[in-house]
Amino acid sequence: MSPAQQLTLPAVIVVASVMLLGCEGPPPGTEQIGYRGVGMENYYNKRQRALSIQANQPVESLPAADSTGPKASEVYQNVQVLKDLSVGEFTRTMVAVTTWVSPKEGCNYCHVPGNWASDDIYTKVVSRRMFELVRAANSDWKAHVAETGVTCYTCHRGNPVPKYAWVTDPGPKYPSGLKPTGQNYGSKTVAYASLPFDPLTPFLDQANEIRITGNAALAGSNPASLKQAEWTFGLMMNISDSLGVGCTFCHNTRAFNDWTQSTPKRTTAWYAIRHVRDINQNYIWPLNDVLPASRKGPYGDPLRVSCMTCHQAVNKPLYGAQMAKDYPGLYKTAVTQEALAGSAPASEAAPAAATEAAPEAPAQEVPAAEAVPAAAEPGAAEAAGSVEPAPVEEVAPAPAAQRL
């Protein structure tokens, strides 16, 4: 063996060993989520799962407070959202929220010291709207959050700004006018796939068409382009990464578009996408004029939410811990629901109707051809505050029980 060969063999062994370090150690965990023998399984790393469970522990609920006595609005000034709570429950809720959102900063993160009624601090205005957001989520979007619900801690996890909030990504700078459409950027947003790096702005902020699969075998019957398919798959990669699952969590991969072969989770995901859009458009964008520059992106757009903001790589946030049920202030009261019944957004009305009657399965029409979402180009976020109406064919899916 020549000296060169003697040096090459150890080098190959070292390189191969380094490459193997990037692989997950066997055996992986497996969960059957569909019919046996058809690949409807979810795979996970057992070591990573144990670490994830440890990192997603809920906060212990505070002891119950007296629900009788005067209301908070009768004792304190400028109480606009939680005015239906007793003083005891109101105080308990304030302490809990401080623990969930600003444990280090304390009450003064949202209140002017010495004058808790003052609105002269932007965080007070924002937090009031966030209370309304949580109440709407728990009361109007049960098709998404079910009876588990959400709390401030679901997103914040002890941080004033949620760790996984996002803004429109301008992408890398190019020296010429020839720009790719976002591929090969190596973005965590699409799980480092070679796909457009910002599927969040067009699909979770705006309401661009997501469906691209046709119903016929021949491609000529489907006007959707390959480029549009890349945007859609970028969103799917983001959702999978955000929930820590694979495609088969929602879809049967032999027919991605067929609702009758999909899992019940796809119905939940349908509502979840619309819930996220509702949060971004109706609760966060209207606060943009109140937020400081430090809470905005390069285009001046506010920090918004995506699936990752709440789920944090877990298919059920905090593994389904029911924290909200211990805090009545995080739900709309009967009085509040009656007052808002006439002004509820249409997107919020759909989930409620889904539990009363079984709507037809989504129509499988061929989606209209669409241009690449404008969010890929710089400056697109300036117009992101406006949302186009949802496509006609995206009616509410049939209840999961009928598709098992």
Curated annotation (Swiss-Prot):
Subunit structure: Component of the photosynthetic reaction center composed of protein subunits L (PufL), M (PufM), H (PuhA) and cytochrome C (PufC). The reaction center interacts with light-harvesting antenna complex LH1.
Region described as Disordered: 346-404
Database matches in Gene3D superfamilies: Photosynthetic Reaction Center, subunit C, domain 2 (1.10.468.10)
Subcellular location: Cellular chromatophore membrane
Protein's membrane topology: Lipid-anchor
Gene field: pufC
InterPro entries, per database record: Multihaem_cyt_PRC_cyt_su-like, Multihaem_cyt_sf, Photosyn_RC_cyt_c-su
Signal peptide boundaries: 1-22
Annotated residues for binding of heme 3: M236, C247, C250, H251
Protein name listed in UniProt: Photosynthetic reaction center cytochrome c subunit
Chain residues carrying a lipid of type S-diacylglycerol cysteine: C23
Keywords tagged on the record: Electron transport, Heme, Iron, Lipoprotein, Membrane, Metal-binding, Palmitate, Photosynthesis, Reaction center, Signal, Transport
Residues with lipid group (N-palmitoyl cysteine): C23
PROSITE patterns, per database record: MULTIHEME_CYTC
This protein's record includes keyword GTP-binding: no
Primary site of residence: membrane
GO molecular function: electron transfer activity; heme binding; iron ion binding
Binding site for heme 2: M130, C152, C155, H156
